[in-house]
Amino acid sequence: MLKAKLAQLCESILQAAQLPDNLALFDARDEYLELFAVLSAMANFPGGGILLFGVSDAADGAPAQLCGVSDAARLTQIIDWQCAEMSPPIQPLYTQTTVDGKRVLAAQIPEIDKARKPCYHLAVGRPHGAFKRVGRMNRPMSEAEIHSYDAYNSRTRDELRPCEQARWADINPDGVETYMRRLESANRLRAGIDREQLLQMEGLMVDGKPTLASILLFSYDPQSFYPQYSIMAAVYEDGKARECRRLNGTLDTLCEQALQFIRRQLPAAVRYPMDAVREALLNALIHRDYSKYAEDLSVYLWISESHIEICSPGMCYGAPDMNTLPRGLRSLRNPKLMEILETLGALPQEHSGMQYMEDTMAAAGLPRPEIRLADDWCHVFFHLPPSDAWPETAVQDEAMAEIGRFLRRQDGAQLLFNLCRVLPAGKAQQVADAD
């Protein structure tokens, strides 16, 4: 960092009411500074962070105060010693300058490579020495967060682990046969392969036991083995829960039940682009954390007057920050689940997560969905306009799609054909394409 840039940073800090999350201030007059937590948090933070010494932190809403550094050489020795106690060791970049006659010292902490995360204090070990930056606080990482890094680095596939308490008789053979026929039609099966070997190759069986993927997609009752691998749905009015339900079933069934719950609870649901909500639900169910550390956690669906919120356990997998999400530039957690659902036709291959949701909402003239990551959870918000503020295109387009869905459920093939003949071409296509 250039000295002039550091001086500008100090001046902006002294005037700012709120400081960025990647900045930590220290009164260097303290005889001993324990920096292990903030060093770990900054090294794990996207883009790293800056430790600024000689500026006291704001208190009770008051601006930060310039206090200066008396012995910069001794301070750098203290910082270097603590950086060497981290794993992997941290190599800070120092910059000194004078502001209003007082010396300040900045230590830039680089973000470590994702393959080496999490950075932690060696003396206490990873379970207690790995920290993350939450706002301007340093918080210990949970076991699930640490496992997420390990799973990414070692390419651990939690969806392929065997379910020890289950038997293959607990799997619905009809669903598996449908999947096998789809594979055969795609020329992915070779003649002469043993049945059990084939199931193992496709990630459905390990040593005679069904895998988690088999349980989630083909079991008669997945929640009998993993009760919390469900959706907890609730409707709120004036901040109070009006209705709460637990939704059970396989992943595709969970998604459809959740969509029905939304349509039933929201008077305006027929006018909302439900394909975007379906994409968010599928992402939450497929790419949530299915590790042993998250077996007690469900996916949550909350509906209020102002928004629909879908909350799933697990942070971004393989994504350094939120900026890589919209274009789908991230690794995938549980890729076998996605592959099977795509093969079965339950997950359109052309959809690309966040970008698809944004495009769908924009086409309907509605606010883009919002994603927030907090405390190892991923929250997706769909903001609902007031009932008198819905764009006309959203009303018409979703109404046409809903008509198509209704006719398909009623097996009204002939009626659907006749309706499409009299509708304008664009509207007829929306009815015919509704899934």
Protein language model features and the residues they cover:
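Glycine-rich/acidic phosphate-handling loop/turn and adjacent ATP-lid/helix
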Residues: 306-345, 388-406
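Generic, well-ordered alpha-helical scaffold segments in large soluble proteins
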Residues: 12, 257, 261-265, 284, ...
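Phosphate-interacting basic helix/loop segments used at nucleotide- and nucleic-acid interfaces
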Residues: 26-46, 194-201, 279-288, 360-364
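Short amphipathic alpha-helical interface segments
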Residues: 398-426
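Polybasic/polar functional segments that serve as interface/processing modules
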Residues: 1-105, 113-115, 275
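Intrinsically disordered, low-complexity regulatory tails
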Residues: 89-168, 293-297, 348-351, 355, ...
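A short acidic, leucine-rich amphipathic alpha-helix
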Residues: 216, 419-420, 428-433
